[in-house]
């Protein structure tokens, strides 16, 4: 087998602070079913959204090293906070092609908006970084970007509270200030939020287009794999292999993560941090 063919068979590496990035894996499985996927959830140190930029960057470097040592061919930073705060550092430090979730979402919002008023919801860390606003305005300075943090959405999604009157009331409290500004496009700037898409869409109303960053990121991944000739699409390639690693509590990851992935997670591998640095294993 040629080196390039061997490269194509290597997995796509995906990392997140916990389980939210599984919504990206779900889209990868749907749109690139032949690709092998290796997922790492840094569940021992979740959430990233409330931590300092320096800490998020350090954690992201360690997660990336783990994936690199597993010989992945492409890396998806499936965490909005890490994409906002650490992606430029990762791209300088590592030679592998990689993508975050912010740029695909920002570009899709510009394609979707009709009145150039775009809303963004995300974690405290993502919104405080201003990453979406900076990128959107750098691409179209005529836009107005309104960003609101929605910290309760993550625990609601992880607890399985994805609809109902309580969730709808929380969504109304968060979204009403955005809707009052006249936005016609809303970026779901956290990989947990696709689980709440139905209730968010209902509260936002039919005049507001939702941009799912997980979907948009996978579109961008597919394009980049084709440009780099790294797509695993040979005739003999069956459905890809999926492996899941976490830094803490594999059983909980399997239980909750299944909702994010849309199917049971049968095996999760725990990365032991007790002696060697875990990313060197």
Model-based region annotation:
Residues 2-281:
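Non-catalytic structural scaffold of enzyme domains
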């Amino acid at each position: 087998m040629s080196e390039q063919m061997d490269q194509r068979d290597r997995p796509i590496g995906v990392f997140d602070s916990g389980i939210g990035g599984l919504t990206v894996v779900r889209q990868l499985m749907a749109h690139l079913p032949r690709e092998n996927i290796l997922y790492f959830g840094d569940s021992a140190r979740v959430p990233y959204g409330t931590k300092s930029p320096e800490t998020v960057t350090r954690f992201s470097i360690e997660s990336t090293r783990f994936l690199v040592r597993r010989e992945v061919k492409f890396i998806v930073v499936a965490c909005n906070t890490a994409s906002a705060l650490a992606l430029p550092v990762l791209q300088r430090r590592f030679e592998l092609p990689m993508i975050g979730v912010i740029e695909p979402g920002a570009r899709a919002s510009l394609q979707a908006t009709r009145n150039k008023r775009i809303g963004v919801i995300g974690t405290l860390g993502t919104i405080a970084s201003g990453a979406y606003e900076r990128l959107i305005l750098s691409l179209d300075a005529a836009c107005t970007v309104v960003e609101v943090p929605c910290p309760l959405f993550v625990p609601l999604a992880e607890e399985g509270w994805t609809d109902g009157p309580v969730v709808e009331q929380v969504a109304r409290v968060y979204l009403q200030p955005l809707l009052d500004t006249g936005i016609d496009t809303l970026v779901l700037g956290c990989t947990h939020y696709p689980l709440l898409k139905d209730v968010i869409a209902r509260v936002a109303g039919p005049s507001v287009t939702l941009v799912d960053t997980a979907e948009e990121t996978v579109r961008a991944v597919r394009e980049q794999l084709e440009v780099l000739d790294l797509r695993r699409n040979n005739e003999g390639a069956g459905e890809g292999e999926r492996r899941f690693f976490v830094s803490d509590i594999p059983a909980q990851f399997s239980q909750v993560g299944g909702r994010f992935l849309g199917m049971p997670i049968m095996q999760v591998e725990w990365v032991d941090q007790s002696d060697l640095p875990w990313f060197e294993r």
